[in-house]
């Protein structure tokens, strides 16, 4: 099962670069490559929205590697925990974005 996240940003180019950079680091850490896809952006009310789809092997690898952190999140479902983890991951690395799961 792959997870798709909706990313919201006010500074698309800078935050896109930040996200790509840190996803690349994550891919290297987990030995997964070409493991996510980005949609075309759309803008509304000063915000830019785009989707980030994780391929299942990348999502599973992240979940296994960081299972101890994911277990601490107060969500009932794995998708909610994964979404919160990725939001915290991007924010901790200077990406000024909001992250929501797409159902």
Regions found by a protein language model. Give the residues of each.
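Generic structural motif
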Residues: 5, 32-41, 95-102
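A structural detector for beta-sheet-dominated domains
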Residues: 6-10, 53-55, 100-102
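Short, intrinsically disordered low-complexity segments
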Residues: 31-75
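A general secondary-structure signal for short beta-strands and their flanking turns/coil
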Residues: 1-4, 45-49, 92
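Alpha-helix boundary/N-cap detector
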Residues: 14-21, 57, 61, 73-85
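Conserved short beta-strand edge segments in small beta-sheet-based binding/regulatory domains
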Residues: 70-103
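Short, extreme N-terminal segment that most often corresponds to the first beta-strand
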Residues: 1-24
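Short, flexible N-terminal segments of the mature chain
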Residues: 16-40
């Amino acid at each position: 099962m792959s997870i798709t996240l909706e990313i919201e940003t006010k500074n698309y180019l800078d935050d896109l670069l930040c996200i790509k950079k840190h996803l690349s680091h994550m891919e290297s850490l987990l030995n997964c490559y070409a493991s996510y896809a980005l949609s075309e952006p759309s803008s509304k009310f000063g915000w830019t929205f785009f989707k980030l789809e994780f391929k299942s092997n990348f999502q599973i690898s992240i979940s296994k590697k960081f299972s101890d952190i994911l277990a601490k999140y107060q969500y009932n479902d794995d998708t909610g925990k994964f979404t919160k983890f990725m939001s915290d991951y991007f924010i901790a690395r200077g990406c000024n974005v909001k992250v929501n799961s797409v159902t």
